[in-house]
Regions:
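Bacterial N-terminal signal peptides that target proteins for export
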Residues: 1-8
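Bilobed "Venus flytrap"/periplasmic-binding protein-like clamshell domains
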Residues: 31-57, 61, 115-184, 279, ...
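Short beta-strand-centered segments that line the small-molecule binding cleft or hinge
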Residues: 105-114
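Hydrophobic h-region of N-terminal signal peptides that target proteins for export
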Residues: 11-20
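Pocket-lining segment of extracytoplasmic ligand-binding domains
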Residues: 90-92, 100-101, 126, 163-262
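An extracytoplasmic/periplasmic, membrane-proximal ligand-sensing/linker region
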Residues: 177, 183-185, 194-212, 222-229, ...
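N-terminal (or domain-start) structured segment
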Residues: 21-89
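Short, solvent-exposed loop/turn segments at the edges of secondary structure
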Residues: 113-117, 250-251
Length: 321
C-alpha cells in the first residue's frame, strides 16, 4: 500500500461523533490507524486481534488495522504522521532508535508485542539439519519490507555468513506465500520468528511435518558476542505441531510504536485499556500472552523510549519507576 493511498483512506486520529448513545449522550469516538504488514503473516493476525479486543473493551476507540509492506514502511509512515500506531519488528526498531543507517527516530513505544525467536523451518523429510546445511540452498527469508530478513541478516552475520551471497535468498511479496514454497520444494527452508507464527504453523501442520533449525549453543554464543542487542529466547515444546522439545535461539521483541506527536492522553487511555484486556487478548491469540505492561518495561531499550502517556500509566500501576 503506498503513502498516497493511505493518506486518501482517511484522516488520522479523528474525534468523530458516533451514532451510539450512552445515557442520552453522544459517544465521542477516537479513530486510530494501525499499520500491520502484508497478508498472511503474523503482524496482520496480531493487529486484527489487537483492534478487536481494544475496540470491544472501550467503545470510545475505533482502531482500524491497515495492511502495509511491514516494519520498514511502517516506520516512515509513522514519522510522516500518516499512521497513528504501527507494528514494528525488533531489528528495524533497534536501528531506528540507535540511528543506524538513518537519523535517530522520535517515535515512541506504546507496548511490547511479543518476543521473536528466529529459526528456519524445513520439511521433515529434508536432509537439512543445521544452518550450515542450508548454505548455497534457496531460502525464503520473509516478506520484503518486514523485519524478518533484517533479523536473519544480523544472526547470519554473527556466524560469518552473508545472507545474499552464501544463500540463494528469496524475498516474498506476500508473507503467506512461504509455506507452500517449502512444501512443494521451491525453497529448502523458510526463515521466520515467533511462537504461533503462521508460516511455521502451516509447515509444521502439513501432512509430512516439519523440522526446525536454529543455531546451536556455540553458534548462539558467537552471534551474541557480535550482536549484543539480540536476546537468548526459547520456543517452548509444543508451540507447533509435533514439536517435542524446546528450541533455544536468539531474537528480539517486536513493538507497537506510536507517532511522535500522538496525544499523551490518548496514549494513556490505550495503555490503560490494553492492561485491562491482557488476559482476554492472551485467550484470543497465543502470541499476545506476552503483550503486558510488565514486559513492555523490560523489553524497552530505555524508559525514555516509552511514550509519555503510557509511562505515566505504568508508574501509576507500579510497573515502572
Amino acid at each position: 500500500m503506498n503513502i498516497t493511498r493511505i493518506v486518501c483512506t482517511g484522516v488520522l486520529l479523528l474525534a468523530a461523533s458516533a451514532a451510539a448513545q450512552d445515557g442520552g449522550k453522544v459517544i465521542q469516538k477516537t479513530t486510530i490507524s494501525l499499520g500491520t504488514a502484508t497478508p498472511g503473516g503474523g503482524f496482520p493476525l496480531y493487529g486484527n486481534a489487537f483492534a478487536e479486543v481494544m475496540n470491544d473493551a472501550d467503545s470510545t476507540f475505533s482502531i482500524l488495522p491497515r495492511n502495509t509492506k511491514g516494519s520498514t514502511e511502517n516506520i516512515p509512515l509513522l514519522e510522516a504522521g500518516q499512521l497513528d500506531i504501527a507494528l514494528v519488528a525488533g531489528e528495524p526498531a533497534y536501528e531506528a532508535f540507535a540511528g543506524i543507517g538513518r537519523p535517530r527516530t522520535s517515535l515512541k513505544i506504546l507496548t511490547a508485542m511479543y518476543s521473536s525467536p528466529g529459526m528456519f523451518v524445513v520439511r521433515a523429510d529434508s536432509p537439512y539439519k543445521t544452518i550450515r546445511d542450508l548454505v548455497g540452498k534457496p531460502v525464503a527469508f520473509g516478506a520484503r519490507g518486514s523485519g524478518l530478513p533484517i533479523l536473519s541478516r544480523y544472526m547470519l552475520d554473527g556466524l560469518g555468513l552473508k545472507q545474499d551471497e552464501d544463500f540463494q535468498s528469496i524475498y516474498l511479496d506476500r508473507a503467506g506465500d512461504g509455506p507452500a514454497m517449502v512444501l512443494d520444494g521451491r525453497v529448502a527452508a523458510l526463515w521466520g520468528a515467533g511462537i504461533g507464527w503462521p508460516g511455521f504453523a502451516a509447515v509444521a501442520g502439513s501432512a509430512g511435518g516439519a523440522r526446525f533449525i536454529a543455531p546451536d549453543a556455540g553458534e548462539i554464543a558467537r552471534i551474541k558476542a557480535k550482536q549484543t542487542f539480540l536476546k537468548p529466547l526459547t520456543v517452548p515444546a509444543g508451540s507447533y505441531p509435533n514439536q517435542n522439545g524446546q528450541i533455544d535461539t536468539l531474537g528480539s521483541w517486536s513493538f507497537i510504536l506510536a507517532r511522535a506527536d500522538l496525544d499523551d492522553g490518548v496514549a494513556y487511555r490505550l495503555a490503560r485499556t490494553l492492561h485491562g484486556v491482557e488476559s482476554a487478548f492472551c485467550r484470543k491469540l497465543a502470541q499476545a500472552c506476552e503483550t503486558t505492561a510488565a514486559n513492555t518495561v523490560v523489553a524497552a531499550p530505555g524508559s525514555e523510549l516509552i511514550q509519555a502517556g503510557v509511562l505515566s500509566y505504568f508508574r501509576e500501576i507500579g510497573v515502572a519507576k
